[in-house]
Amino acid sequence: MSTGPGKKAIRNAGGVGGGAGPSAGGPRGPAGQAVKFARRTSSGRYVSLSREDIDMEGELAADYTNYTVQIPPTPDNQPMLNGAEPASVAMKAEEQYVSNSLFTGGFNSATRAHLMDKVIESSVSHPQMAGAKGSRCAMPACDGSAMRNERGEDVDPCECHFKICRDCYLDAQKDGCICPGCKEHYKIGEYADDDPHDGKLHLPGPGGGGNKSLLARNQNGEFDHNRWLFESSGTYGYGNAFWPKGGMYDDDLDDDVDKLGGDGGGGGGGGPLPEQKPFKPLTRKIPMPTSVISPYRIFIVIRMFVLLFYLTWRIRNPNMEALWLWGMSIVCELWFAFSWLLDMLPKVNPVNRSTDLAVLKEKFETPSPSNPHGRSDLPGLDVFVSTADPEKEPVLTTATTILSILAVDYPVEKLACYVSDDGGALLTFEAMAEAASFANVWVPFCKKHDIEPRNPDSYFSVKGDPTKGKRRNDFVKDRRRVKREFDEFKVRINGLPDSIRRRSDAFNAREDMKMLKHLRETGADPSEQPKVKKATWMADGSHWPGTWAASAPDHAKGNHAGILQVMLKPPSPDPLYGMHDDDQMIDFSDVDIRLPMLVYMSREKRPGYDHNKKAGAMNALVRCSAVMSNGPFMLNFDCDHYINNAQAVREAMCFFMDRGGERIAYIQFPQRFEGIDPSDRYANNNTVFFDGNMRALDGLQGPMYVGTGCMFRRFAVYGFDPPRTAEYTGWLFTKKKVTTFKDPESDTQTLKAEDFDAELTSHLVPRRFGNSSPFMASIPVAEFQARPLADHPAVLHGRPSGALTVPRPPLDPPTVAEAVSVISCWYEDKTEWGDRVGWIYGSVTEDVVTGYRMHNRGWRSVYCITKRDAFLGTAPINLTDRLHQVLRWATGSVEIFFSRNNAFLASRKLMLLQRISYLNVGIYPFTSIFLLVYCFIPALSLFSGFFIVQKLDIAFLCYLLTMTITLVALGILEVKWSGIELEDWWRNEQFWLISGTSAHLYAVVQGLLKVMAGIEISFTLTAKAAADDNEDIYADLYIVKWSSLLIPPITIGMVNIIAIAFAFARTIYSDNPRWGKFIGGGFFSFWVLAHLNPFAKGLMGRRGKTPTIVFVWSGLLSITVSLLWVAISPPEANSNGGARGGGFQFP
């Protein structure tokens, strides 16, 4: 079979496309269909060829040099698309051109492709990577790279093996298709006829498939929005070209489905029956043991009644001696009871879940009649990594995160990774290129030896025996080689800042010399020379289009063009094994060496446009990925979170692909952290929330979205409702009403726009999503590909098996140019991005708001806890940094409370207990007001000599004992069903008081200022520390950073200590000591101080050193106690030489 361009047959199913009817002329295919021939023009369009054109061998015009197959596949007519068939030369050239070009564009500027033969200064070997080494073009005066295939081997369009680059090859086509080497016509090979029964269903690409005309941006609004799949005869579903009503299936199919109890659904019960196999679920919901959860619920009810009786008793028995103290305490206790209810009620139904990866593999990656070659039928996945400042977020951390993603255990051809650099820094760009280069060694090594974790920095830092469980004889040799390569990689990364600076200084000096030379030649005055801009230069000797080290117009952090670079081009559809070469240090001959697609993106920023911080960057990633790869699912990470479990993605996919998966909007993984001090002084692990609260929400409508480590359904992010929605009506929203589509017939057809959103009409589509035809064409494709298999009658709106086994279309320049357009600063103007579509704007906690909107539309979410932690990240262990982090979260909660995202205003699609949990999110910061007052009440009691009750009678003590016992019992039971440690629970309680009296209080003040005075709130990016190998990883724990957030807890601690000393001295020297009230007030003061213990340790700095503050406190306390002693009981001796009554008497 020829590797050059050739003719391919284009078959059209009946009624689809021109000339497809039975009367159409021309030869017939094996299925009795008309056969047409087509050529692909230089503009990307497909033009039909007549029989006369085909017979004109050797006389084709330049446009006739590239042919491709365009077969509308159906179960009757399915193309042969195996990876052994080579792509056309021109297509390979376009792929190479895309991967070697840096695309820029944006506001009032044309999109440009800058061809880069050199991306980084180090050599590049992997054929998928931009700037990969290879032969040079043999044309005179041309220094371009010769065209290459997926192995990096030269592509020779002529038998004379003349090396030629893409541009020269296109020029040769225009000059009569004559090879510049042998001066003969390029020979056009013939492809064998395709097997019509390959068993694969073809899907158009994200930009409209083979219709390249859609890839050009439609500025005139000519796109037909009524055709974008949301129509009765769309592209997918039962009853169209991809799933015919008749033909190869029995006419009694619907009767069979009815007997099974199915009601159809766009490829669900109404489609063809799958192979008759016993249905195997991919997931299981495991309820908590009754012996644990039943007592837990009982104790909640008991404590509710105890609190009710206690508060009633307190209100009916005021302390008349100190009404002011009694009033303050009553108000605080009422709020605490209300807050406790909001926190505990959503915890009544925690669940566990499990997945079956073996069943997932059996369903989606095992050969079957619908998938004879065993290609992966799993949906695509786009992974997002966001970073903003390489100075605060070390590029080495970001690079190792990228490497862990590229090595994840998921079909390579279905995976794509996008890096959003909101700072537009060349340092981040070159670090990503270095990571792509190192992935050539790291990813095959991980696959060959089943490495965990797949972050190289973490893997080589793990203590223990690295050979445990390894059976291959060459593991030790391979590991030693990769370790050396990684050390060299780290050195290159660490040297990038200096390398970029030296390079830029050298080029800027050259430009200065050129300017001086020009001035001398023109005779101008050198003293009046114009100032040359100090640019930042790329490795190929051109200006970096992003942010420069010395800010300049169009090259600043808030003012630069959009940048897009395909670091690793999309892989070939079939496995590509390494070559057995003695020169290679590592043998990858039995390892698939393909790498997932990797894209660097920096969205355009201009003055006058609100960039909306991280939410805006995420929305730009959503649009960019939709145009380029359009994975129906998206996984987002912060740059400091990496994949710790290579199987985690598959476990999440089990939930999406199982029964009921079509109603799941996202899968949230728990956040786990490394580098936390062993005692977890400031509750950084937050296990009570991630293992307790989130697991409990999983038993309701689902966990909240918490910012990172979350896999989304793309269609849900677009603001659509789920296919089946439950409304909760009646008293306390307890009555569940399930609503489906209005028209029962729609379950056997492609879904319409009004099925998902009754308000969405064709003319409103651009207003909602923006004026990008390829983007809008990608939406229905993503919806279809995200459906679970229609292998069970309960699966509504499923898809047939084998529908996703075809390779994705290759990237071409118009597609990448459109991706640059959708990340421009003006694209979101007058659209619903950030309001209804994508990540929601207007809050510093955009993650919680985005998840809330999805739940409010009726979507569900799932909490996926894996045996091995799925993802690991870093967290600030310094006290001040931790408080600032909590301040940002709490400020976002206050914003939510005063916005239309308040759970009070939620729709009926939100469950009652889920509504309460979201209500608690907006209310919890206000607890800080009452907590601050309550922490001062013990001190005020000790100073005044009164207590919150008139006397410590038996009733008060019984209530206090009962509430304490129920609180401890609930804590123990919660520890048992959530799997956390009792120490973690206590640390959480301590930090609740610390943050409640500092960060939460400031958040309330800031939120009120924003709502009432319109004062905007700005937060600085939390710095991620990158410790050296020999540095103490806990060094930051002992650093004392002064902040105003520290003032309230310090004041509370000092006041309570002084109050205890004051009351103790007064009681001892009192004529009538009242020890009961002192013990009552002293007990609560000690309780407050016990909660502040981690805070005090944080102020004392490093262990083993006595900081100055200790001496200051000691001196202050000594002076205070001495003065109180003298003031209360002056040393006045009586005639017997004894002290006054009530004091000590020495012998």
UniProtKB/Swiss-Prot annotation:
Q: Where is it localised?
A: Golgi apparatus membrane
Q: Where is the active site?
A: D422, D847
EC assignment: 2.4.1.-
Alphabetic keyword roster: Cell wall biogenesis/degradation, Glycosyltransferase, Golgi apparatus, Membrane, Transferase, Transmembrane, Transmembrane helix
Q: How does it sit in the membrane?
A: Multi-pass membrane protein
Residue ranges crossing the lipid bilayer per the database entry: 292-312, 322-342, 929-949, 954-974, 1001-1021, 1045-1065, 1075-1095, 1108-1128
What is the enzyme's class at the highest EC level?
transferase
Question: According to the UniProt record, where is the region Disordered?
Answer: 1-33, 259-281
One GO term (biological process): plant-type primary cell wall biogenesis
Instruction: Work out whether the entry's keyword set contains Glycosyltransferase.
Output: yes
Return the InterPro entries for the record: Cellulose_synth, Nucleotide-diphossugar_trans, Znf_RING/FYVE/PHD
Record-level Gene Ontology MF annotations: cellulose synthase (UDP-forming) activity
Sorted alphabetically, the Gene Ontology cellular component annotations on this record are: Golgi membrane; plasma membrane
Gly residues composition bias: which ranges? 14-29, 262-272
Coiled-coil annotation reads none
What family is this? Answer: Belongs to the glycosyltransferase 2 family. Plant cellulose synthase-like D subfamily.
State what this protein does.
Answer: Thought to be a Golgi-localized beta-glycan synthase that polymerize the backbones of noncellulosic polysaccharides (hemicelluloses) of plant cell wall.
Task: Report what the protein is called.
Answer: Cellulose synthase-like protein D3
**Native source species:** Oryza sativa subsp. japonica
Name of the coding gene: CSLD3
